[in-house]
C-alpha cells in the first residue's frame, strides 16, 4: 500500500490501517450495533479483560443523538467516526508508536506543537476508567491516550493501552478545512469525480437529528430499554459448549445504552432518573464482564 500523505478522509483511514497493521494489530471491522463511542466495541470493552494479549485497530461509527444539529454546525455531529487502537499489554514505546501514526498521516512533528495534557478517562456507563491524556496538536485536541485500569468494574490485568482518534476533527486539521461537510471524502483527483463528506452524510445528519429530537416514541423507547435489560441475564443464563452467551448479552447492553441516549435526546429522562439509568446499564455491563473473564481464565 502507498504510504504517501493521504489526500482524503477515506485515504486517511487507509493510512492508519496500514500503519497499525505494520505494528502487528489485527485490523477489524466496525461493530454492527449502535454505540456512543468506539471504545464500546466488544474488541475493546471485553478484550481488554482477561489475561490474553490482544492488539487490534478499527474504525467505529459512533452515535450521540443529543449532539445532532441538523447539519448546520460545521464541527458537531450526531453520527461520526472514531479510530480505535487497543494494545494489550501496553507496549513501553506506545507514545512513540502513536507519534509515528501522526507522521504517517502527514503531520510534521518538527513544525507542530504536540502536547499530552493529563485528562484521566472515565465511562461510568460501562464501569470503566483509566489514566489518560488528551493529545493536542497546535492547541486542538486530536486524540485520547489512555491506560485502562478497570472495565466493567474489574481490574484490567495486564494493563491495556488505548488510542482514540476523532477522525473528522483530525481530518479537518490535516486537510485545512473549517467545515466538516467540506472534507474531501475520496481523493480529489478521482477518475469518477470528487465527493465531499457532506455529499455522503449531510442529509443523514438532517434526518437523524429530526428523528432523535422529535421522531421517536418515548413510550416505545422505554419499553425497548426494559426488554433489552431483561434479555441480558437470560442470555448469560444460556450456554453453548459450556460457555455463557456473553457476546449476544453484551450486544443487548449496547442496545440498551443507545436507547438511553435516544430517550435523553428526546428530553424524556429527568435529572433524578439519569443516574438510575446509567447504574442499570453499568450493572448489565458488569454481568457481561464477569462472565467474559470467567471464560477467559478457564480457557
UniProtKB/Swiss-Prot annotation:
Q: What class of enzyme is it?
A: ligase
Entry EC number(s) = 6.1.1.14
Keywords annotated in UniProt: Aminoacyl-tRNA synthetase, ATP-binding, Cytoplasm, Ligase, Nucleotide-binding, Protein biosynthesis
Q: Which GO terms describe its cellular component?
A: cytosol
Q: Name one Pfam family in it.
A: tRNA-synt_2e
Compartments where found: Cytoplasm
Per the UniProt entry, what are the Gene Ontology biological process annotations, in alphabetical order?
A: glycyl-tRNA aminoacylation
Q: Which residues cross the membrane?
A: none
* Predominant place of localization: cytoplasm
GO terms for MF: ATP binding; glycine-tRNA ligase activity
Q: Which reaction does it catalyse?
A: tRNA(Gly) + glycine + ATP = glycyl-tRNA(Gly) + AMP + diphosphate
Q: Which InterPro entries match?
A: aa-tRNA-synth_II/BPL/LPL, Gly-tRNA-synth_heterodimer, Gly-tRNA_ligase_asu
* PANTHER family (UniProt xref): GLYCINE--TRNA LIGASE, CHLOROPLASTIC_MITOCHONDRIAL 2, GLYCYL-TRNA SYNTHETASE
What protein family does this chain belong to? Belongs to the class-II aminoacyl-tRNA synthetase family.
Q: Write the protein's name.
A: Glycine--tRNA ligase alpha subunit
Amino acid at each position: 500500500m502507498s504510504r504517501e500523505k493521504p489526500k482524503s478522509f477515506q485515504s486517511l483511514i487507509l493510512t492508519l490501517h496500514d500503519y497499525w497493521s505494520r505494528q502487528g494489530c489485527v485490523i477489524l471491522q466496525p461493530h454492527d450495533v449502535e454505540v456512543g463511542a468506539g471504545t464500546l466495541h466488544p474488541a475493546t470493552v471485553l478484550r481488554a479483560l482477561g489475561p490474553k494479549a490482544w492488539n487490534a485497530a478499527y474504525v467505529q461509527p459512533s452515535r450521540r443523538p443529543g449532539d445532532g444539529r441538523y447539519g448546520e454546525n460545521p464541527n458537531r455531529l450526531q453520527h461520526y467516526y472514531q479510530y480505535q487502537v487497543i494494545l494489550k499489554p501496553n507496549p513501553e514505546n506506545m507514545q512513540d508508536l502513536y507519534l509515528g501514526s501522526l507522521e504517517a498521516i502527514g503531520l510534521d512533528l518538527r513544525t507542530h506543537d504536540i502536547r499530552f495534557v493529563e485528562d484521566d478517562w472515565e465511562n461510568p456507563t460501562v464501569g470503566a476508567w483509566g489514566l489518560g491524556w488528551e493529545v493536542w496538536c497546535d492547541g486542538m485536541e486530536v486524540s485520547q491516550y489512555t491506560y485502562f485500569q478497570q472495565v466493567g468494574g474489574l481490574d484490567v490485568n495486564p494493563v491495556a493501552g488505548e488510542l482514540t482518534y476523532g477522525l473528522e476533527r483530525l481530518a479537518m486539521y490535516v486537510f485545512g478545512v473549517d467545515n466538516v461537510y467540506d472534507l474531501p471524502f475520496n481523493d480529489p483527483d478521482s477518475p469518477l469525480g470528487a465527493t465531499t463528506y457532506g455529499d455522503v452524510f449531510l442529509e443523514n445528519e438532517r434526518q437523524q437529528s429530526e428523528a432523535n429530537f422529535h421522531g421517536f416514541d418515548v413510550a416505545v423507547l422505554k419499553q425497548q430499554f426494559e426488554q433489552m435489560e431483561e434479555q441480558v441475564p437470560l442470555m448469560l443464563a444460556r450456554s453453548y459448549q459450556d460457555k455463557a452467551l456473553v457476546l449476544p448479552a453484551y450486544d443487548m447492553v449496547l442496545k440498551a445504552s443507545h436507547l438511553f441516549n435516544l430517550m435523553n435526546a428526546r428530553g424524556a429522562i429527568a435529572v433524578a432518573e439519569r443516574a438510575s439509568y446509567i447504574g442499570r446499564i453499568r450493572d448489565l455491563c458488569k454481568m457481561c464482564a464477569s462472565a467474559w473473564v470467567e471464560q477467559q481464565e478457564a480457557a
